[in-house]
Amino acid sequence: MGIKDLVKDAHNNAKNHGFWEDWERIEQLENMAINISKDGEKQVKIDKCNAIATRLMLIVSEVSEALEGIRKDNIDNFKEELADIVIRVADLAGGLDINLEKQIKNKMDKNKYRPYKHGKTF
């Protein structure tokens, strides 16, 4: 499976299981806010930022679960949680219409020319 298919499938699955209901409500409010006021538009932007932050924290929770898999010497759980991390990232990219494959390629190209350990100690 390629990255584009992964993003599409992960997002569709998350959406079908209710993980984007908040975003859909925000978009409905956004459509109404356009006709209401600048304050309404500002609130929609804040709500979208909060929804993105929630999804980022879900990614962090999967990272924590992967760590626990290692701490408990459960390599199968660790592998499963790594998959969850990628799925959540792909879902977020799909929901925000980010071309994740392009972003990954650009970042990998950028990293080729960075200093050893990117100039840091570790």
Each model region followed by its residue ranges:
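Flexible "arm" and connector segments at domain edges
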Residues: 1-82, 86-122
